[in-house]
Design a protein with these regions (language model features):
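ATP/Mg2+-dependent ligation/transfer catalytic cores
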Residues: 1-205, 247, 394-454
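Broad gene-expression machinery/nucleic-acid interaction feature
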Residues: 24, 104-108, 144-148, 214-216, ...
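Conserved structured core elements
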Residues: 7, 40, 124, 143, ...
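Acidic, His- and aromatic-enriched active-site or binding-groove loops in soluble protein domains
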Residues: 164-189, 224-235, 239, 273-279, ...
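Catalytic-core signal marking the mid-to-C-terminal active-site face
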Residues: 7, 20, 233, 240-241, ...
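A generic structural motif
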Residues: 31-33, 112-118, 181, 221-227, ...
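Short glycine/proline-enriched loop/turn "hinge" motifs that connect secondary-structure elements
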Residues: 96-103, 141, 206-211, 258, ...
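Histidine-centered divalent-metal-coordination microenvironment in nucleic-acid enzymes
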Residues: 148-162, 208, 212-220, 252-273
Length: 454
C-alpha cells in the first residue's frame, strides 16, 4: 500500500516560506482536457488565507474549448448563468515542491460550488466518485500510466510560427530501446527525471521509442488519484522544462503519419491489506473478480472510448500494425489487443492500450473503474483470450472517429448508470464543440488538394 505522507508537509512549507526558500505557491486543478488551471500565489498570502479558505476561479474553466473560447451547451456554466465562480480547495496531500520553477510549491485543488457541494463534472470529482464506489466493495485501484512524447529541437514559439510543420525531431531514426539514441538528449531526459523526483514522483525508467524524437519516462504505480494527479503535474512540468531548455515536446496522440504517442494505463486491485486480488490459481492465474472486472472492460470499451480518446486526433492512432489497438479484445501479453493482461501473482494487472498522450487521466481511470465495476456487479463472464493477431481478427472494432465515440457515450446505459446524466451530457457537449470546430476548419490537406487542382 502506498505511503500517503505528502511530498511536502504544511509545517515544512511554513519553514521554507519563513526562510525565503519558497515564495510562490501554485494552486491548480485538472480541467476537461487534463490541463492544470489555477493561480500563482505569494506564499505568505497562501499560508495566511488560501490554505484555510481556498480561492475562487471562473466556472467557465470547465466549459471552454481547447483555445479557451466560451461555447454553448454546458448546463453548469454559460452567459445566461453569468459565468460565476466555483471554489478551489487545496488538497494538502498533494503539496510538493516543483524544482523546475525556483522558489515554488504546488497543490492540486478540488472544486466546489458556493454552497459546498462538489462540482460533479470536474474530472477529479468524477474519479473520486468511482473510487468511492470501488471502496464500497472493499477495493482500491492501483494505477500506472506510461506517457510517450516527441521532442523537437525547435522552441514552442518557433513551432507555433511554423504552424507545427517542418520541425526538427531530436532524433533522426527509430531509437526504440536504443541507449545510443537516447543519449542524444539525455541531459533533457535526466533533468526531467530528477526534477520529477524532487516533486515527489517515483521515476522508474526512460527509453526511446519508434517515431524519430519519441521517448517515454515511466513512473511507479500508485493509488489511482495519486497517479492521475502526478500524471498532470508531470505533463505540465515536462513542457515547462523543455521550454526552459530551448526545445519543445508534444504529447499529442498522432503528430504525424508514423507511430503515435500512447498512454497505456495499467490497473490492479488491492484489498484492505494491500493484497492484489486479481491473481489466484484460476484459469490464466486470474481470480474471479479479475475475470469479471476485465469482462466489464470489454463490455464498456466502445461506450467509454470518449474517455480514453477524447479528441479528433486521438482516433488517428488506431491503425493496423501500429501497436495502437483496433480490436475490442483481450489477451495474455498480446500487444495487438486493446486489453493486455500482464504479470502474475502480486503483479497481476491489465493494461488498457487505447489512450494516447492526449488523454485526461482522471477521466480515463474513472472509466476503467466504472467499466470494471459493471462487470463485477453484473458478474459478466470473460470470453476466451485472443491468442493471435487481433488486427486481422473478427473482433468488434474500437470507434474510428470522435463522432462515433460521442454517440456511443451519449446513448450508453452503462455510462448513465455509472456517471449520471449530468456528466454524460457535459462530456458529450465537449465532443460536440470539438467536432463543430473541426467541421468548420479548412485544413492543410484540403488546401494541398484543392488550391490549384480544383
Amino acid at each position: 500500500v502506498a505511503d500517503r505522507t505528502p511530498p511536502l508537509s504544511v509545517e515544512e512549507l511554513h519553514a521554507l516560506v519563513a526562510s525565503g526558500e519558497i515564495d510562490t505557491v501554485v494552486l491548480a486543478f485538472p480541467d476537461m482536457q487534463g490541463r492544470l488551471q489555477g493561480k500563482r500565489f505569494a506564499a505568505r498570502f497562501f499560508l495566511d488565507e488560501v490554505l484555510h479558505h481556498g480561492t475562487e476561479g471562473c466556472n467557465y474553466l470547465l466549459a471552454v474549448d481547447t483555445d479557451m473560447n466560451t461555447v454553448d451547451g454546458y448546463e453548469m456554466s454559460s452567459w445566461d448563468r453569468g459565468y460565476g465562480d466555483f471554489a478551489m480547495h487545496p488538497d494538502l496531500s498533494t503539496l510538493r515542491r516543483v524544482p523546475w520553477n525556483a522558489g515554488t510549491a504546488m497543490l492540486v485543488a478540488d472544486l466546489a460550488w458556493n454552497n459546498g457541494s462538489p462540482v460533479v463534472a470536474a474530472p477529479r470529482q468524477i474519479l473520486r466518485r468511482q473510487l468511492e464506489r470501488l471502496a464500497e466493495h472493499g477495493l482500491t485501484a492501483q494505477v500506472g500510466t506510461e506517457l510517450e512524447f516527441i521532442v523537437f529541437k525547435d522552441t514552442y514559439e518557433q513551432a507555433w510560427d511554423a504552424n507545427y510543420r517542418g520541425l526538427t525531431p531530436a532524433n533522426q531514426y527509430n531509437i526504440d530501446y536504443s541507449v545510443l539514441g537516447t543519449g542524444r538528449i539525455e541531459p533533457l531526459l535526466r533533468r526531467i527525471r530528477n526534477e520529477m523526483t524532487g516533486a515527489g514522483l517515483t521515476v522508474e525508467s526512460a527509453k526511446g521509442e519508434c517515431n524519430p524524437g519519441q521517448h517515454e519516462i515511466v513512473f511507479k504505480y500508485d493509488e489511482a488519484l495519486v497517479t492521475c494527479d502526478q500524471h498532470a503535474i508531470y505533463k505540465t512540468g515536462a513542457k515547462e522544462i523543455a521550454a526552459q531548455e530551448g526545445v519543445s515536446l508534444t504529447f499529442m496522440a498522432k503528430y504525424n503519419e508514423r507511430e503515435g504517442n500512447s498512454c497505456h494505463i495499467h490497473l490492479s486491485l488491492t484489498d484492505a491489506d494491500g493484497t492484489n486480488v486479481m491473481a489466484d490459481d484460476g484459469p490464466g492465474g486470474m481470480s474471479p473478480i479479475m475475470r469479471h472486472f476485465l469482462a466489464g472492460q470489454l463490455a464498456a470499451l466502445r461506450d467509454f472510448s470518449l474517455l480514453y480518446a477524447p479528441n479528433i486526433n486521438s482516433y488517428k492512432r488506431f491503425q493496423p500494425g501500429s501497436f495502437a489497438p483496433t480490436a475490442v479484445a483481450w489477451g495474455h501479453d498480446n500487444r495487438t489487443c486493446a486489453l493486455r493482461v500482464v504479470g502474475h501473482g502480486r503483479s497481476m494487472r491489465f493494461e488498457n492500450r487505447l489512450p494516447g498522450g492526449d488523454v485526461n487521466p482522471h477521466l480515463a481511470v474513472a472509466g476503467l473503474v466504472a467499466a470494471g465495476l459493471y462487470g463485477v456487479e453484473q458478474k459478466l463472464e470473460l470470453p476466451e483470450a485472443c491468442t493471435g493477431n487481433a488486427y486481422t481478427s473478427e473482433y468488434e472494432h474500437v470507434p474510428t472517429t470522435l463522432r462515433e465515440a460521442a454517440e456511443l457515450w451519449e446513448n450508453s446505459p452503462i455510462a448513465k448508470a455509472a456517471f449520471g446524466d449530468e456528466v454524460v451530457a457535459h462530456y458529450r457537449n465537449m465532443a460536440r464543440v470539438e467536432l463543430d470546430a473541426f467541421d468548420a476548419a479548412v485544413t492543410d490537406w484540403e488546401l494541398r488538394r484543392s488550391f490549384e487542382r480544383m
